[in-house]
C-alpha cells in the first residue's frame, strides 16, 4: 500500500479501526482521555439505570433511558474510532515499509577496496564498520557511506519516488539506506549502524511505538478541557437539588445527557486523532518526524535558516570564468585550478576541470600517477587543493586563502580583491587560487535563484516568519543573492560555529528556529534547532542530531514542514473553537426541555421549537455523537491552510468555525428532532 495513495477511508482500515474502537472501551484505555472517560462513566451509569427501570426496580421510562445510554456508548465508540483510524493509517504506512525488510545475504569484503576477497554472510549479522560490496540487482544490506564507486540506486521502497538517484563516494551523495536496490554499476559501502539500528528499523519503530507521547500544546489543551469538564460537572450536579426543591426532580439520565452535551466532547474525542494525523501527514510528505513534539514545534516556528545551495538556488554552481591576477596568464590559472580540482568530486570541482578542458584543452590527469597528495575541503580550512612536485596549490574562499597566503609570508594582491568584489556583486561565488604564497586569480562559480522562491518568502513574511539565508559565500555575494531571492537576512561565510551561535541568538530572543542539514558538521546546529530536518542522503550524525528526516533530501521541504505543522495547530484550534461554540446550541436544546416543567419561564429559551422534552434531549445527544464522525475527515486531513497573518487567520477561523459551531448544531438538532417525530420514535 503506497504511503502517498492511502485513501482516507480504506475499507480494511475502517474495519480494523472499528475492532480497535471496541477494544478501547476498557477503563484503562478510556482513562487516557479524561473528557471521554466522563462520557464512558455516564454511559455505564445510564445503562445501569436502564436495566433497573426495565426490571421494575426503579421508576421511569426505560425506553428513553435505553436510547440515551445507547447513544452515549456510540459517542465513546466514535471517539475511539477516530483515534483508531488515525493510528491505523500510520501503521499501514509503516507496514508498507516492512515489506522492504528482507532476509538477504551480503558480500562482506576482507579489505576496504573493490576486488578484495569477500565472504557471504547474512545481512542481519553485519556490524558497524563492516565493508560490503553491492552490484547491479543487489539490495543494499545496511545503512552506510559509499567509500568507493558510483551507482544508480532505486530508493522508491523508502521514498516512494520512482526516479533513481546517483550515489557515489565523496560529496553530499555518499549516504545509502538499507533496503534500497542497486540498478547499475557497483558500490563499496562501510556500514554505519548495527543490526536493529537502521533507518528503516527506526522508521517502523517510531510509527509503531508503544504509546504516543502528548505534546506540550496538547497537554495544555487537555488541562483546559478537564477544567471545563469539572466546571460543567459541578454545575450539572447543583441542578438536581434546584429541580427537586421546585417539586419536579430531574432524572439522573437527563442530567447525564446534559453533562455530556455541555462538556467539549467533540474536541475531546478528536484530539488524539489530530496529533496522530499530523505525524501521518508529515510521513505523507516523505518526512519522518521523531515525535509529535517536532511536528507541533514546526507550527510555531518563526525563524527559518535556509541553506542557499539547493534551497534558494538550483544548487548546481558551475565554474563560468577564470579571472587571472595581474601578471598571470589565464592558462596558468586554469592549469593550477584544474590540478587542485582533480580529486575534488563535488559538482563545483568537476565543473572547474571541465572548464579548463574546454578553454585550454587541458586534459584530466590521474592524481595517483602524478604522485600527488590531495588536500580535501573541511569546514574549518574552507579550502582544498593538491601537493605535487613541491608545489602547494590551494583553492578556496577569499578569507581562507588570504590567511593561507599571509601564513606563508606572502601578500594578497589588491587587484585580486577588486576582482573578487566584481564577481561577488554579480551574484557569483568567487574562489581564489593560490600556489605557495602567490595568488594566481579567481574562479567565478555561477548559480541560479529558483523561480517563484521570492513569492514563497513573501508569503512566509506575511505569516510572521523570518527567513535567513545561510551560505559560505562572502558578504557581497550573499547580499546580492539575498536581495534577488527576497530573504529577510543572511549569514555569510558561515561556519558550523557561526550557525550554532546564530540559532542560540534567536532562541535567546524567544524565537523558535528551524533548519536543514546533511553533513556531520551540521550536527551541532541540528541538535540545537527546535525543528531540525536532516537529509536522508546526509550523514548518520546529521540524521541522529535532527528530529525529522526528509526522505527526498530536498532542502526546500523545510517550508512544507512548517506548513504541515501550522496546519496541525490550526486544525486543533479550529475544532476546539467549533466544539466550545457547539455547547451554546445544545444548551438551548436541553435546558428548556429538562427544567421547563419545574420553571415554565425557561420555555422562552426553546427557540428551536423542539417537539417534546424527550425528543429535545435525545436529539442533542444524537447530534453530539454524530458530529464527531462528520469531523473525522477534517481531523485527519487538516483544515484548509492559507498563508495569512496571525490576526487575519484568527478572524477567518472565528468566522468559519466559531460561527459554524453556533449555527450547525441548531440546524442539526432541529433536523434530528423532526426525523424522530416523523418516525414516531418519541
Curated annotation (Swiss-Prot):
GO terms for cellular component: plasma membrane. Mg(2+) binds at residues 518, 522. GO terms for molecular function: ATP binding; ATP hydrolysis activity; magnesium ion binding; P-type potassium transmembrane transporter activity. Keywords: ATP-binding, Cell inner membrane, Cell membrane, Ion transport, Magnesium, Membrane, Metal-binding, Nucleotide-binding, Phosphoprotein, Potassium, Potassium transport, Translocase, Transmembrane, Transmembrane helix, Transport. InterPro entries: ATPase_P-typ_cyto_dom_N, ATPase_P-typ_P_site, ATPase_P-typ_TM_dom_sf, ATPase_P-typ_transduc_dom_A_sf, HAD-like_sf, HAD_sf, P-type_ATPase_bsu_IA, P_typ_ATPase. Its EC number is 7.2.2.6. The active site is at 307 (4-aspartylphosphate intermediate). ATP binds at residues 344, 348, 377-384, 395. It is a multi-pass membrane protein. CDD domains: P-type_ATPase_K (cd02078). It catalyses: K(+)(out) + ATP + H2O = K(+)(in) + ADP + phosphate + H(+). The keyword Protease does not apply. The system is composed of three essential subunits: KdpA, KdpB and KdpC. NCBIfam families: ATPase_P-type (TIGR01494), kdpB (TIGR01497). Belongs to the cation transport ATPase (P-type) (TC 3.A.3) family. Type IA subfamily. This is Potassium-transporting ATPase ATP-binding subunit. It comes from Escherichia coli O17:K52:H18 (strain UMN026 / ExPEC). The lineage of its organism: Bacteria, Pseudomonadati, Pseudomonadota, Gammaproteobacteria, Enterobacterales.
Amino acid at each position: 500500500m503506497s504511503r502517498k495513495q492511502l485513501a482516507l477511508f480504506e475499507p480494511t482500515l475502517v474495519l480494523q479501526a472499528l475492532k480497535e474502537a471496541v477494544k478501547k472501551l476498557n477503563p484503562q484505555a478510556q482513562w487516557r482521555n479524561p473528557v471521554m472517560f466522563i462520557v464512558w462513566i455516564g454511559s455505564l451509569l445510564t445503562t445501569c439505570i436502564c436495566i433497573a427501570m426495565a426490571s421494575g426496580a426503579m421508576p421511569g421510562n426505560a425506553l428513553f433511558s435505553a436510547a440515551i445510554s445507547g447513544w452515549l456508548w456510540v459517542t465513546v465508540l466514535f471517539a475511539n474510532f477516530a483515534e483508531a483510524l488515525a493510528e491505523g493509517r500510520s501503521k499501514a504506512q509503516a507496514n508498507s515499509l516492512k515489506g522492504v525488510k528482507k532476509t538477504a545475504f551480503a558480500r562482506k569484503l576482507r579489505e576496504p577496496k573493490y576486488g578484495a576477497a569477500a565472504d557471504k554472510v547474512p545481512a542481519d549479522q553485519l556490524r558497524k564498520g563492516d565493508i560490503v560490496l553491492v552490484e547491479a540487482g543487489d539490495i543494499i544490506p545496511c545503512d552506510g557511506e559509499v567509500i568507493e564507486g558510483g551507482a544508480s540506486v532505486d530508493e522508491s521502497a523508502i521514498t516512494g519516488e520512482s526516479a533513481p538517484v546517483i550515489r557515489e563516494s565523496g560529496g553530499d551523495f555518499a549516504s545509502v539506506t538499507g533496503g534500497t536496490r542497486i540498478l547499475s554499476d557497483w558500490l563499496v559501502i562501510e556500514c554505519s549502524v548495527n543490526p536493529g539500528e537502521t533507518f528503516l528499523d527506526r522508521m517502523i519503530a517510531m510509527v509503531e511505538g508503544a504509546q504516543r507521547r502528548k505534546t506540550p500544546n496538547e497537554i495544555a489543551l487537555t488541562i483546559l478541557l478537564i477544567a471545563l469538564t469539572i466546571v460543567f460537572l459541578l454545575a450539572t450536579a447543583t441542578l438536581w437539588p434546584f429541580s427537586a426543591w421546585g417539586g419536579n426532580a430531574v432524572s439522573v439520565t437527563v442530567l447525564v445527557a446534559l453533562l455530556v452535551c455541555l462538556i467539549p466532547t467533540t474536541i475531546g474525542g478528536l484530539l488524539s486523532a489530530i496529533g496522530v494525523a499530523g505525524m501521518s501527514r508529515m510521513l505523507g510528505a516523505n518526512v519522518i518526524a521523531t515525535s509529535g513534539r517536532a511536528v507541533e514545534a514546526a507550527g510555531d516556528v518563526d525563524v527559518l535558516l535556509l541553506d542557499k545551495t539547493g534551497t534558494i538556488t538550483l544548487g548546481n554552481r558551475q565554474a563560468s570564468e577564470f579571472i587571472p591576477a595581474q601578471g598571470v596568464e589565464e592558462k596558468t590559472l586554469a592549469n593550477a585550478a584544474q590540478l587542485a580540482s582533480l580529486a575534488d568530486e563535488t559538482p563545483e570541482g568537476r565543473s572547474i576541470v571541465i572548464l579548463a578542458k574546454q578553454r585550454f584543452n587541458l586534459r584530466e590527469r590521474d592524481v595517483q600517477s602524478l604522485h600527488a597528495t590531495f588536500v580535501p575541503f573541511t569546514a574549518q580550512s574552507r579550502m582544498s587543493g593538491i601537493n605535487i612536485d613541491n608545489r602547494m596549490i590551494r583553492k578556496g574562499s577569499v578569507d581562507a586563502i588570504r590567511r593561507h597566503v599571509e601564513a606563508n609570508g606572502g601578500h594578497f594582491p589588491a587587484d585580486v580583491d577588486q576582482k573578487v568584489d566584481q564577481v561577488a556583486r554579480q551574484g557569483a561565488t568567487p574562489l581564489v587560487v593560490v600556489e605557495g604564497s602567490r595568488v594566481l586569480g579567481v574562479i567565478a562559480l555561477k548559480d541560479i535563484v529558483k523561480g517563484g522562491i521570492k513569492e514563497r518568502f513573501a508569503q512566509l513574511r506575511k505569516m510572521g516568519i523570518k527567513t535567513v539565508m545561510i551560505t559560505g559565500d562572502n558578504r557581497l555575494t550573499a547580499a546580492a543573492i539575498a536581495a534577488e531571492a527576497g530573504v529577510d537576512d543572511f549569514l555569510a561565510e558561515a561556519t558550523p560555529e557561526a550557525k550554532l551561535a546564530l540559532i542560540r541568538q534567536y532562541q535567546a530572543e524567544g524565537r523558535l528556529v528551524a533548519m536543514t542539514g546533511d553533513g556531520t558538521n551540521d550536527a551541532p546546529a541540528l541538535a540545537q534547532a527546535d525543528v531540525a530536518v536532516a537529509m536522508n542522503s546526509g550523514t548518520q550524525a546529521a540524521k541522529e542530531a535532527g528530529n525529522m528526516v526528509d526522505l527526498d533530501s530536498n532542502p526546500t521541504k523545510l517550508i512544507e514542514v512548517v506548513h504541515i505543522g501550522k496546519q496541525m495547530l490550526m486544525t486543533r484550534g479550529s475544532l476546539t473553537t467549533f466544539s466550545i461554540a457547539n455547547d451554546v446550541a445544545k444548551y438551548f436544546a436541553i435546558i428548556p426541555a429538562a427544567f421547563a416543567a419545574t420553571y415554565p419561564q425557561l420555555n422562552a429559551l426553546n427557540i428551536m421549537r423542539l417537539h417534546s422534552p424527550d425528543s429535545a434531549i435525545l436529539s442533542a445527544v444524537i447530534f453530539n455523537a454524530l458530529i464527531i464522525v462528520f469531523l473525522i475527515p477534517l481531523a485527519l486531513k487538516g483544515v484548509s491552510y492559507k498563508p495569512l497573518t496571525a490576526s487575519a487567520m484568527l478572524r477567518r477561523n472565528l468566522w468559519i468555525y466559531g460561527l459554524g459551531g453556533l449555527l450547525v448544531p441548531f440546524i442539526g438538532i432541529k433536523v434530528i428532532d423532526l426525523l424522530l417525530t416523523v418516525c414516531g420514535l418519541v
